[in-house]
């Protein structure tokens, strides 16, 4: 009798088959349908100790599942039960053999792919129980895989993407229209299971393993997440997003899950379709799952991946028509907040690029929604570290100009202005607002005069400046309040706020535009924020010519911006306070700030030829030392003249222009009363005097359309009202009486109307304001008395210079004030005096004799900040800047020609362009040798260690050989070589002091020749 051959199964197959219950017990294994626990432990132990057998186990499972899936869809319940057990076995193998998943990854994905195709018999719907177990196995795979096979193994990659596609299709399934009785719970369960699978892929290493395949994966993952997000109500979105912020769990619906970390410590969740008696999931659960999956994906992205996700968001919105603006803005804000901090800037930047790529046509929902999304992001509490503020501003300004050229009243312009204004909400560096205003001013200056839309472009960009200040000021207040630095609002009696006119003095005159104060509650200090620097007056000066634009809408818009600047940005000056003992002439003076080294008279005008010969005690105080931007000459663009023929009546000043000027002057005298008095008093005298001489209309001269007589009367009203404000602020009764008499001599009603109240809440861009013309004067001739000033200028000056309050504030005697106020005033001279005399590094005065002596004295001081003075071919210190130049690592962007200014360069004053920056660095020869530079640096360092400390005595070389050496500590107020006096120095020594040297505007220094 022969032997029967032994046909036993392979051990791995035997262990696998042993995990299943007997065929007769399969139907009774429900509802859990679990493998036999003891045999499953043997299988996992065997596979763990013999990883080489995993491939065979995977192949055997694949064969079984392929057969079971087909039979289960045909209605065979035994095969369906066996399929559920097979998927449980697969998940157990994935969990226990996590280190060797790659050995059976291909079979695993094929098993999952086959299981997702199972349908309920005769109904055709998705079998949620089978799909749930397949999703659990897929999540286990994505949790423990390193993703190295995705993108490398074509078969595996194709199967992986097919699984994602099926999950994406199930995540957007809609069962509400497929039957007469919609099953919302069934739809929500289906979507939740599919979203769980997509969440596993979104949090897996596989999505980031291949740079080439990352876009393909997010093409399958992002749209289903966005569909479920946008189907939720806005209230649900806000609630679920808030929960995500409070709950750090990355899982969409379970908490026992660790997304990252070592593979051995990761945990894969179990999923279930439904538990009998359990209430079905709601739409809020689906929205929460979608948001959490999106949150988990975005948290792991770098800048390139985040940009690609934003592109998919834009593509999704393009497909759905950008119809949900509120949800669009909310999603954009949340996406920005969930991206890592250093990459958040990509969202607004990419959205602005989308706007720039759109064609100039009638605004579409895409225009409005994309712009609203950018504005929402900029206004949100989310910080955008690394945001290129200037680059973003340039794109937005270019878009504004394009839209204005397309349509002067384009509906997108208000939103664009609001978007630009939002750049002031968050501060990322101290000079951010300065740079924004300067960039807007430069863009205004670049507009060609031939541009037909020039006026409207300027008006809109000016509204952008105002909007930036409004948003910045509001953000500053919010930041201060959050820090507990609440500033009490001052009452009108607080110093620095307007005082009711004629309080307790004379009977109130006729009603004037000053009856209501300029600022109802003026702050004692405008800029208090520690987040940023205030807008520099040097930056703002570039915009001042807009007050003289020929178009009234531009003038009125800029006037409001200027008043806002004075209210919120201009630093408060010393406020005079009258004392009863002095009859209203006392003052509270601030200690003048002095700086070491050279002093420039940049805060006062040049009243005449004797300005440089002021005596001791009547000189100007030096402004506090600070890093300031250079002044550039800014003469008016279109100076308003009394032309014989005008294209429009608003080409010259209108009543509302005078009202704006009155408000601006009043604001100046409240914000910086001392500086306003010094610069404004000579102007008021000159304007009153010139109005009678220049604005004269004679019979038949054809100047009726220039409103000559009306403007002259308005000027005199303005001058009288401002003098009355000055008298009230400084407590000078004589000037107050004189101003009131002048006002009483003018016929009523006054030509200057009250200034229009600004909109509340502020409107970032409104329609252009319409000008109002004067009422035509019927007289054809004038008497000779009208050519004289309305106010007695001698009486005004006498009362002004004798005021103890003014003398104490300026620290000048009566004679010094007389010379200060009684000088010849002109627009050109005033602009010259508003600029720096010369930059210490770049410019030199025309008078070399004084300059050489001054430079020699300066170089003997301990003042290293005064660079490279071109006097007696003096040597200068070699520093690291020279080494950087020699190495070629320094890019010098400073040009002596300067950037284009708003100013008109037609005037002879502008024939010489000013330097762009007063701090232009010294330049070395491009051929300088690095070794030589290093030698010079160490040579200077050795000399510096041997130099004596303390007071440095140096003999000033000049034409006179008998001139004595002078001792300097660097504390002098000026460098004049005549009229010097001796005083006590910082160490008690007698040192030379002298009045300020009024150096004229210099010319550029040839640094290369001097060095």
Swiss-Prot record:
Residues 489-501 have a biased composition (Pro residues). Residues 478-510, 571-636, 891-927, 955-1011 are annotated as: Disordered. Residues 576-592, 609-625, 910-922 have a biased composition (Polar residues). It holds the Pfam family EFR3. GO terms for biological process: protein localization to plasma membrane. InterPro entries: ARM-type_fold, EFR3, EFR3_HEAT-like_rpt. SUPFAM superfamilies: ARM repeat. Belongs to the EFR3 family. This is Protein EFR3. It comes from Cryptococcus neoformans var. neoformans serotype D (strain JEC21 / ATCC MYA-565) (Filobasidiella neoformans).
């Amino acid at each position: 009798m022969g032997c029967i051959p032994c046909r036993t199964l392979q051990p791995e197959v035997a262990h696998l088959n042993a995990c299943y219950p007997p065929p007769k017990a399969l139907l009774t294994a429900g509802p859990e349908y679990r493998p036999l626990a003891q045999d499953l432990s043997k299988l996992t132990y065997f596979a763990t100790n013999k990883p080489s057998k995993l491939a065979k186990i995977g192949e055997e499972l694949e064969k079984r599942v392929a057969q079971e899936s087909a039979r289960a869809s045909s209605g065979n319940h035994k095969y369906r039960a066996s399929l559920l057990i097979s998927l449980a076995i697969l998940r157990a193998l994935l969990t226990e053999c996590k280190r060797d998943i790659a050995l059976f990854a291909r079979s695993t994905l094929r098993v999952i792919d086959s299981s997702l195709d199972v349908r309920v018999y005769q109904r055709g719907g998705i079998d949620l129980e089978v799909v749930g177990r397949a999703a659990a196995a897929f999540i286990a795979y994505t949790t423990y895989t390193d993703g190295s096979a995705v993108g490398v193994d074509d078969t595996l990659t194709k199967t992986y993407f097919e699984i994602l596609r099926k999950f994406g299709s199930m995540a957007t399934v809609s069962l509400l229209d497929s039957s007469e009785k919609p099953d919302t719970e069934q739809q929500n369960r289906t979507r939740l299971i599919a979203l769980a699978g997509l969440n596993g892929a979104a949090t897996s290493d596989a999505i980031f393993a291949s740079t080439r395949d990352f876009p393909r994966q997010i093409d399958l993952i992002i749209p289903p997440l966005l569909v479920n997000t946008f189907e939720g109500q806005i209230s649900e979105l806000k609630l679920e997003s808030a929960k995500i912020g409070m709950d750090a769990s990355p899982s969409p619906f379970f908490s026992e899950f660790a997304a990252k970390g070592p593979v051995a410590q990761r945990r894969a969740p179990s999923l279930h379709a439904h538990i009998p008696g359990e209430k079905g999931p709601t739409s809020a659960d689906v929205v929460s799952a979608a948001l959490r999956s999106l949150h988990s994906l975005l948290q792991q992205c770098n800048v390139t991946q985040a940009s690609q996700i934003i592109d998919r968001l834009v593509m999704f919105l393009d497909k759905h028509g950008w119809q949900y603006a509120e949800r669009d803005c909310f999603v954009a804000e949340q996406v920005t907040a969930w991206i890592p901090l250093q990459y958040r800037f990509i969202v607004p930047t990419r959205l602005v690029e989308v706007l720039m790529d759109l064609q100039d046509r009638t605004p579409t929902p895409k225009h409005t929604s994309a712009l609203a999304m950018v504005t929402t992001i900029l206004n949100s509490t989310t910080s955008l570290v690394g945001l290129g503020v200037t680059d973003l501003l340039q794109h937005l300004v270019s878009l504004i100009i394009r839209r204005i050229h397309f349509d002067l009243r384009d509906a997108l312009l208000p939103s664009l202005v609001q978007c630009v204004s939002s750049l002031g909400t968050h501060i990322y560096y101290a000079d951010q607002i300065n740079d924004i205003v300067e960039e807007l001013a430069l863009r205004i200056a670049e507009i060609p005069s031939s541009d037909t839309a020039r006026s409207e472009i300027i008006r809109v960009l000016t509204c952008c400046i105002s909007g930036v200040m409004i948003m910045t000021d509001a953000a500053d207040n919010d930041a201060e309040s959050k820090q507990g630095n609440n500033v009490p609002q001052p009452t009108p009696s607080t110093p620095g706020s307007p005082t009711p006119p004629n309080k307790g003095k004379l009977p109130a005159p006729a009603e004037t535009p000053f009856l209501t104060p300029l600022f109802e509650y003026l702050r004692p200090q405008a800029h208090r924020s520690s987040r940023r620097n205030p807008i520099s007056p040097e930056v703002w000066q570039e915009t001042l010519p807009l007050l003289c634009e020929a178009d009234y809408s531009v003038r009125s818009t800029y006037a409001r911006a200027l008043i806002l600047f004075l209210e919120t940005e201009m630093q408060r000056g010393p406020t005079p306070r009258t004392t009863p003992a002095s009859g209203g002439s006392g003052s509270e003076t601030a200690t003048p700030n002095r700086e070491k080294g050279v002093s420039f008279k940049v805060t006062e005008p040049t009243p005449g030829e004797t300005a440089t010969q002021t005596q001791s005690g009547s000189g100007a105080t030096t402004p506090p030392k600070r890093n300031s931007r250079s002044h550039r000459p800014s003469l008016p663009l279109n100076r308003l003249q009394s032309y014989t023929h005008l294209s429009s009546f608003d080409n010259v000043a209108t009543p509302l222009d005078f009202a704006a000027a009155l408000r601006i002057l009043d604001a100046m005298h409240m914000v910086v009363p001392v500086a306003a008095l010094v610069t404004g008093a000579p102007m008021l005298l000159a304007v009153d005097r010139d109005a009678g001489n220049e604005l004269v209309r004679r019979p038949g001269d054809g100047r009726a359309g220039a409103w000559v007589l009306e403007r002259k009367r308005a000027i005199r009203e303005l001058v009288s009202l401002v003098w009355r404000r000055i008298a009230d602020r400084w407590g000078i009764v004589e000037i107050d009486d004189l101003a009131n008499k002048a006002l009483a001599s003018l016929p009523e009603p006054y030509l200057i109307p009250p200034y229009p109240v600004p909109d509340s809440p502020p409107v970032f861009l409104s329609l252009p304001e319409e000008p109002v013309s004067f009422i035509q004067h019927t007289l054809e001739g004038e008497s000779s008395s009208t050519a004289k000033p309305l106010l007695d200028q001698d009486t005004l000056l006498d009362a002004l210079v004798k005021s103890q309050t003014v003398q104490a504030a300026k620290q000048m005697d009566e004679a010094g004030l007389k010379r200060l106020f009684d000088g010849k005033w002109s627009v050109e001279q005033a602009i010259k005096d508003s600029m720096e005399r010369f930059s210490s590094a770049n410019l030199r005065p025309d008078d070399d004799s004084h300059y050489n002596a001054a430079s020699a004295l300066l170089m003997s001081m301990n003042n290293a900040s005064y660079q490279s003075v071109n006097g007696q071919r003096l040597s200068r210190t070699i520093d690291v800047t020279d080494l950087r130049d020699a190495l070629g690592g320094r890019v010098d962007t400073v040009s002596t020609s300067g950037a284009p200014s708003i100013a008109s360069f037609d005037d002879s004053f502008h024939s010489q362009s000013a330097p762009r920056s007063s701090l232009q660095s010294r330049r070395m020869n491009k051929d300088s040798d690095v070794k030589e530079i290093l030698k010079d640096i160490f040579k200077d360092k050795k000399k510096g260690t041997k130099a004596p400390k303390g007071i440095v005595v140096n003999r000033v070389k000049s034409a006179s050989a008998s001139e004595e050496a002078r001792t300097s500590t660097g504390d002098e107020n000026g460098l004049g070589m005549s009229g010097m006096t001796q005083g006590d120095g910082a160490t008690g020594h007698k040192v030379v002091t002298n009045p300020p040297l009024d150096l004229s505007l210099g010319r550029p220094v040839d640094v290369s020749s001097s060095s």
